[in-house]
Amino acid sequence: MGERGEVYSEKLFTESERTYFFNVKENRKGDYFLNIVESKRSPSGDFERHSIFVYEENINEFESNLLKAIAVIKQKVSTGSVGSSARHNKGYGEYGERSKLDDSRFDKKSHLSGGRFKKKDY
């Protein structure tokens, strides 16, 4: 069956109080997957975690698209076309939490009538 469980793990500590974990794991069937986790401290002192899983069958496409996205960021930074983080974080508070946006002009009944969309309270 192999090594089952965690095969590889790397932590990345940042100055913005975020920690990223890059984990390679093996499931019960012997398949490998990548688990990327972001952990950050919330204003209340708790930790908020966000996680994505990338499975073996998608790893090549994921790598290709991730490298393209990173190249765009690097190109934008090198040409100085990246603005202040405040502009890019619309709808987020000082600590990265979602802030309630003004939806007073939004017709909730017509948008929600299909039942597919639900109002989120942040």
From Swiss-Prot:
Superkingdom classification of source: Bacteria
GO molecular function: purine-rich negative regulatory element binding; RNA binding; RNA polymerase II transcription regulatory region sequence-specific DNA binding
Region called Disordered, residue ranges: 77-122
Observed effect of gene inactivation: Essential, it cannot be deleted.
Pfam families named in the record: DUF3276
Per-repeat ranges for PUR repeat: 3-76
Cellular compartment(s): Cytoplasm
One GO-annotated biological process of the protein: regulation of translation
Keywords per UniProt: Cytoplasm, DNA-binding, Repressor, RNA-binding, Transcription, Transcription regulation, Translation regulation
Stimuli inducing this protein: Highest expression occurs during conditions of slow bacterial growth and division (at protein level). Inhibits its own translation. Transcript levels are high in unfed I.scapularis larvae, decrease as the tick larvae feed on mice and rise again as the larvae become nymphs; mice that been infected for 1 month have no detectable transcript (they remain infected with bacteria). Transcription may be under control of DnaA.
Family: Belongs to the PUR DNA-binding protein family.
Other remarks in the entry: Both isoforms are expressed in vivo; the experiments here were performed with the shorter protein which is shown here.
Protein's name in the database: Transcriptional/translational repressor BpuR
Organism expressing this protein natively: Borreliella burgdorferi (strain ATCC 35210 / DSM 4680 / CIP 102532 / B31) (Borrelia burgdorferi)
Gene: bpuR
